[in-house]
Each structure stands twice: as C-alpha cells, then as structure tokens.
C-alpha cells in the first residue's frame, strides 16, 4: 500500500472490545490569529529536543466557528471568567484585610508576561508551582484566606484573569530554575508512558496521531498555552489539570489528584513543548 504524507488509511486501535478509529490526516489551517489587535504566535520553532520541528497552537486544528469565536473577545465566552477574575482581584478576603490588588496594584502592569513564565520552582515547597498554586500561596501567607478547592469558580476565574494579562506573550519557562529540569525529565517520562485499559500515552494522540481525526476531534499537539480554556462541549471553562485528568480518565486509568507530583511534572513538560507559542488565555476549543 502506498502511503502519502497527508492521506493515510484509517488506523484502528482495539483494546478491551473498544474500537477507536484514527482517520485520515488533515493539515492545520494556514491562518493568522489576532486578538484585540495583538498578533498571536501560533507556529513557533521548537526548542532543541522537541519531537516536532514546529510547535503548533491548538487553534490551528479547530473548526472555523471555534477559531472565529476565540479571535473576537466580545464573542469569546471565556472572557466572562476573565471579568469575574478582575472582580476577585480587587476583592478583600481573609484576616489580613487584603485583596490581590493590595500588593500587586494594577494587574495589567504587575502581571504582564507572568503567565508565560510558569510553572516556576518553589524553593519553599521544593517542587514546581503553577499559577493556581501561587494564588493559593498568596491567599494563605499574605491574605490570611483559605486556599481554593481544586477547580473552584474563583480559582479558574482568577487564573484566567492573571494569564490573560500575558495575552500574546510567547511561552518561555526557565528550566534552570531550581530543580525544574529534573521535573521536566519526570514529565517527559510520564508523557510517553502508556497507561490504562486502552494502553494509551499522551504521545499516542498528540504526537503519533497528531493531525488525524478520532471520532470528530482533529487531534492537535495538545499544547497548554491557552489554558484555562473555554470548551463548547462542556459549556464552561476547563483548567489544565482538569484536562489532564480528563484525558487520563479517557484511557480508563486511575486519575492522579490535581497538582500531584505526577501532574505538576507533566505540566512542566507539556508547557515546555509549547515554547514560543503565544499565551491565548482564554482560548476556545470544541
């Protein structure tokens, strides 16, 4: 059988009686994304050691309606979470009588580019810290407030608001920070480890089958640069660790806890795979 680069015969995976069909390839669109007059980098030269020559935003793999919705801030439902996050930013909570703004003033200035640099190394906890965990650390240590429960409305909204201040900024983590490189290695191992009853790894869909269709979903590289993301199929915002857990659930494997060592290592590695792509939060996906 002759196999071309673009058109491949359907591939079937059968595990435990479940058949998954990976159908013919379809190239990502050749379009430019501009949000609020800010050009987004949706194609970026991959860093050394990356499996692809080019990092590709998931926006390039979505249907026209989804792409158009993200490009229009007035139409993007995820902007409601950003607006809610702005309210929380200025709301006093906790025994210290402080809000986020009490220490950080105008987020447009103090949080500019911050979302493109996380995860970072937390020397106190001796592990990586992401935006959500940094919010909780500030709430507990500086505000005297309770940490958010995972995926609480306030946590997702405030994370969206903070990351939105980096809209258009290319993702760039510093792997020389603390022990991040070691966690990158752990995350890479997890990314390629097959698990669950379906015996799938992250790489099974987002590397080996990137560009193919599984059911009606055009498989992308699984980039993290748009999270938290508004998803049409859930009708709401989805955090990165929610998405990780959802993918793991779909392989019929036991789900790790959010912000566990496993998922923090995975976040470090997956974020690195999107080096150079613009922060799109809140991205819109199907």
From Swiss-Prot:
Record's cofactor remark: Binds 2 heme groups per subunit.
Database matches in SUPFAM superfamilies: Cytochrome c
Residues the record lists as binding heme 1: 100, 103-104, 138
Cofactor names: heme
Residue positions binding substrate: 243
Signal peptide coordinates: 1-26
Catalytic residues in the record: 247
Induction per the UniProt record: By thiosulfate.
The protein's Enzyme Commission number: 2.8.5.2
Subunit structure, interactors included: Heterodimer of SoxA and SoxX.
Protein name, UniProt field: L-cysteine S-thiosulfotransferase subunit SoxA
Organism per entry: Pseudaminobacter salicylatoxidans
Highest classification ranks of the organism: Bacteria, Pseudomonadati, Pseudomonadota, Alphaproteobacteria, Hyphomicrobiales
């Amino acid at each position: 059988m002759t196999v071309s680069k673009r058109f491949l015969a359907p591939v079937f995976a059968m595990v435990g009686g479940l058949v998954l069909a990976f159908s013919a390839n379809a190239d990502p669109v050749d379009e430019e994304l501009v949000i609020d007059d800010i050009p987004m980098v949706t194609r970026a030269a991959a860093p050394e050691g990356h499996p692809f020559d080019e990092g590709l935003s998931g926006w390039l793999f979505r249907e026209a309606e989804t792409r158009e919705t993200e490009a229009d801030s007035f139409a993007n439902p995820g902007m409601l979470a950003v607006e809610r996050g702005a309210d929380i930013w200025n709301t006093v909570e906790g025994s210290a009588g402080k809000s986020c703004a009490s220490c950080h003033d105008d987020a447009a200035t103090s949080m500019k580019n911050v979302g493109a640099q996380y995860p970072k190394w937390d020397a106190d906890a001796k592990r990586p810290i992401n935006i959500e965990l940094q919010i909780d650390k500030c709430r507990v240590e500086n505000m005297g407030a309770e940490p958010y429960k995972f995926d609480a409305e306030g946590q997702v909204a405030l994370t969206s608001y903070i990351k939105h201040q980096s809209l258009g900024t290319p993702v760039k983590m510093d792997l020389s920070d603390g022990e991040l490189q070691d966690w990158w290695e752990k995350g890479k191992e997890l990314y390629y480890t097959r698990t669950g009853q379906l015996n799938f790894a992250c790489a099974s869909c987002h590397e080996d089958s990137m560009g193919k269709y599984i059911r009606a979903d055009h498989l992308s590289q699984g980039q993290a640069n748009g999270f938290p993301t508004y998803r049409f199929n859930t009708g709401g915002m989805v955090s990165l660790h929610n998405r990780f857990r959802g993918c793991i659930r779909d392989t019929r494997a036991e789900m790790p806890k959010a912000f566990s060592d496993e998922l923090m290592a995975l976040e470090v590695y997956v974020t690195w795979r999107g080096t150079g792509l613009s922060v799109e939060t809140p991205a819109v996906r199907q």
